[in-house]
Amino acid sequence: MTRKSRRLWLVGACLLGLGTATALVLNAFSSNIVFFMAPSQVRAHPPAADRTIRLGGMVVAGSVRRQTQGDTPIALFDVTDGQAAVTVRYAGILPDLFREGQSVVAVGTVAPDGAFRASEVLAKHDETYMPKEVAEALRRSGKWDPRYGKAPDAASWNTMTVGDARHGEANRS
């Protein structure tokens, strides 16, 4: 084997190793990325059943239902962005700051029946905080325009009922 062919084999092996390492890193990143979606996006373009997403919006007033399955507490509630609502099923204890009419981010997957199976529920920490993703979803839905002030507070969402959220209408009296 000549010196030139040995060098060519070495360069080829290095490129093959670099390509393999790049493919492995990209595969690891793609399986660990969790995308944020608003309820209207989930309704319009449901993600694959095995795809983990973050669902963010406001908890619809009057939608929280509590059950038990054995010793495990089950919470069912609707999350809305003002245009659509998605029912969330969470097995576990909800955060202390979880309230109807407050912003929430749930991490989980969409079931074949369209319900969202949450593995984690994150509640806001005070009445003025709204997660960046939820505020962005409200802006995109037309429920809030940053040129006209801060995002709507929880009190303005407390008047939205389950029926209004499912039909995309906010009952603002």
Curated annotation (Swiss-Prot):
The keyword Chloroplast does not apply. Keywords: Cell inner membrane, Cell membrane, Cytochrome c-type biogenesis, Heme, Iron, Membrane, Metal-binding, Signal-anchor, Transmembrane, Transmembrane helix. It is a single-pass type II membrane protein. InterPro entries: CcmE, CcmE-like_sf, NA-bd_OB-fold. It holds the Pfam family CcmE. The keyword Transmembrane applies. Residues 164-173 have a biased composition (Basic and acidic residues). Residues 29-173 are periplasmic. Heme binds at residues 125, 129. One of its GO terms (cellular component) is plasma membrane. GO terms for biological process: cytochrome complex assembly. Residues 148-173 are annotated as: Disordered. Disulfide bonds: none annotated. It is found in: Cell inner membrane. GO terms for molecular function: heme binding; metal ion binding. Residues 1-7 are cytoplasmic. The chain crosses the membrane at residues 8-28. Belongs to the CcmE/CycJ family. Heme chaperone required for the biogenesis of c-type cytochromes. Transiently binds heme delivered by CcmC and transfers the heme to apo-cytochromes in a process facilitated by CcmF and CcmH. Also required for indole-3-acetic acid (IAA) biosynthesis. This is Cytochrome c-type biogenesis protein CcmE.
